[in-house]
Regions:
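Bacterial N-terminal signal peptides that target proteins for export
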Residues: 1-8
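Bacterial N-terminal signal peptides
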Residues: 8-17
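Sec/Tat signal peptide C-region and signal peptidase I cleavage site
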Residues: 18-23
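Central antiparallel beta-sheet cores of small beta-barrel/beta-sandwich binding domains
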Residues: 24-119
Length: 119
């Protein structure tokens, strides 16, 4: 079984917090995510797509997460997968989003920025 990368964890922390309480949110749909490392020993960049339906994100590697997306579009979240942890914040507006993330894999620390674009 392929282990989730720190990028997937960071993505989960930014998108996964959508909950049933935000059903049929303004953020439902398919989103392309791009993560860029600015500091640390993570991959330089990572891209993948997630789907949000009725306010719930679907991606096969989401494990433990908590957080939320406010009606204003403000995003705050964190996720843990095995020895990896990431947290992030930012904002969604219309069909795009952006923010910052930071995390660790074992004793290694990484940080950077993320962008999102609705398909």
């Amino acid at each position: 079984m392929k282990k989730p990368s720190l990028w997937m964890i960071a993505a989960a922390c930014l998108i996964a917090p959508l909950s049933a309480a935000h059903a049929r949110s303004a953020y439902d749909g398919s989103w392309d995510l791009a993560f860029v490392t600015q500091s640390g020993a993570c991959d330089p960049s990572y891209n993948f797509t997630v789907n949000v339906a009725d306010g719930i994100v679907t991606h096969p590697n989401l494990v433990r997460f908590k957080g939320y997306v406010a009606k204003s579009g403000s995003v705050h979240a964190s996720v843990t997968v095995q020895d990896k942890f990431a947290s992030g914040s930012g904002r969604f507006a219309g069909t795009s989003g952006r923010g910052k993330w930071s995390g660790r894999a074992g004793s290694s620390r990484c940080s950077g920025y993320w962008t999102a674009q609705r398909n």
